[in-house]
Curated annotation (Swiss-Prot):
GO terms for molecular function: D-threo-aldose 1-dehydrogenase activity. It catalyses: a D-threo-aldose + NAD(+) = a D-threo-aldono-1,5-lactone + NADH + H(+). The keyword rRNA-binding does not apply. Catalyzes the oxidation of L-fucose to L-fuconolactone in the presence of NADP(+). Also active against L-galactose and, to a much lesser degree, D-arabinose. Uses NADP(+) as a hydrogen acceptor much more efficiently than NAD(+). It comes from Pseudomonas sp. InterPro entries: AKR (IPR020471), FDH-like (IPR044477), NADP_OxRdtase_dom (IPR023210), NADP_OxRdtase_dom_sf (IPR036812). This is D-threo-aldose 1-dehydrogenase. The active site is at residue 58. Substrate binds at residue 145. Keywords: NAD, NADP, Oxidoreductase.
């Protein structure tokens, strides 16, 4: 696959098949200097990546600011940018001297806090504030960010209709939901009029719970999918799995470890790096428009783009399917 070739179009929006998830330039897990963050983004651009995903949540706005500063140096029609709504950034009255937002894994000052707001006014404010931080004339794609963490019913009654309204007005080109909860994704697809959904860690080479209900719902409603967190917390990021790897911030269950070992062995038999298979697996489904990967070092972006472009033999997918490690096409 080519990272610069649109995999499909949604709402008139061509989504490149490989995207960069910009949480790391918002100081996720470790602090980056402005120069280090710029180098990461430059590496992504040089590797041909033209889809960039961010959110106010990422570094309390730092990701949007850094990404926007970088993208302002590039031709606007040459990239797609998505951000998210549902939480507004407001002054934090409980800010601690020298305090950091490490409770949310971001190494940034905690001078702001996130406030849920699913009203139309809140959605419009979120868009305006994101545009200001990004410094861009428009946002291509807007996701509602993890609404089930607050109130999914309220989101369906208020936030999604607001997203549909701003799309109809041309404020954004396409709308969706970003979540790692299959039930929330399925309900949103069935009860709202969405163009794309971002499925985080639920349709990966290691496990595919989204295949049961989310993908069928998307097929029924002509909704595209952007697959994120495809490395399963890093478990698939190296060709040789590690038993002490973390799974969703906890210990890796024995059952998943056994699956991981079997998948890695089949990849070795076909001379395919495990991370390459992890990046390309979601795109074996015609519903998946793009795969978004992260990274906090330039070399990671360069390598991921190479993995995305690697030619993988059909026999690999056939053997994985025969072993019932991935769904049968």
């Amino acid at each position: 696959m080519s990272s610069t070739e649109p995999a499909a179009a949604a709402a008139g929006l061509a989504i490149p098949a490989l995207g960069y998830g910009a949480a790391n330039v918002g100081n996720l897990f470790r602090a980056l200097s402005d120069d280090e963050a710029w180098a990461v983004l430059e590496a992504a651009w040089d590797a041909g990546i033209r889809y960039y995903d961010t959110a106010p949540h990422y570094g309390l706005g730092l990701s949007e600011k850094r990404l926007g500063a970088f993208l302002q140096t590039k031709p606007r029609d040459e990239f797609v940018v998505s951000t998210k709504a549902g939480r507004l950034l407001r002054p934090n009255p409980e800010r601690r001297p020298s305090g950091l937002d490490t409770d949310n894994d971001f190494h940034v000052p905690d001078d702001l806090r996130r406030e849920w707001d699913f009203t139309e006014q809140g959605i419009r404010a979120s868009i305006a504030e994101s545009q200001e931080r990004l410094g861009l004339d428009r946002i291509d794609l807007l996701y509602l960010h993890d609404p089930e963490r607050h109130d999914l019913d309220l989101a369906l009654a208020s936030a999604f209709p607001a997203l549909e309204k701003v799309r109809a007005e041309g404020v954004v080109k396409a709308i969706g939901i970003g979540s790692m909860v299959s039930d929330a994704l399925t309900r949103a697809v069935r009860e709202a009029d969405l163009d794309l959904i971002m499925v985080a860690g639920r349709y990966t080479l290691l496990e595919q719970p989204a295949a049961t209900e989310v993908l069928p719902a998307c097929a029924e409603n002509a909704t595209g999918i952007v697959a994120a967190s495809v490395f399963n917390s890093g478990l698939l990021a190296q060709s040789e799995p590690k038993r002490d790897g973390r799974y969703e911030y906890g210990q890796l269950p024995d059952e998943l470890w056994d699956r991981l070992v079997r998948i890695a062995a089949i990849c070795r038999n076909h001379d395919v790096p495990l991370p390459a298979a992890a990046i390309q697996f979601p795109l074996q489904s015609a519903l998946v428009r793009s795969v978004v990967v992260g990274g906090s070092r330039p070399a990671q972006l360069t390598q991921n783009a190479e993995y995305a472009a690697l030619e993988i033999p059909a026999g690999l997918w056939a053997e994985l399917a025969e072993a019932r490690l991935i769904p049968t096409p």
